[in-house]
């Protein structure tokens, strides 16, 4: 399956960051740290339970240049897939 952004979930491995239970601003801060450790164009999947993270990750991706490929919510768990800028 390929999204309209061109992301093919089978083609690239994701680094997973679990921030469930953490409140603002910790999910975003942990994601920033994780992205800093990744190579350009690497994928980071973040799981969070803080509802404020929806806004935080959308704004962060626009301001930082990292691409937000997915933003989903299921049973109170938010999932974000970020692609580190090249």
Question: Language-model features: where?
Answer:
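N-terminal first-folded block
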Residues: 6-37
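Core SAM-dependent methyltransferase catalytic element
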Residues: 79-86
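Amphipathic, hydrophobic secondary-structure cores in small proteins
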Residues: 25-71
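Intrinsic-disorder/low-complexity, polar/charged segments enriched in Ser/Thr/Lys/Arg/Asp/Glu/Gln
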Residues: 12-14, 41-45, 77-79
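Cationic, low-complexity basic patches in intrinsically disordered or flexible, solvent-exposed regions
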Residues: 3
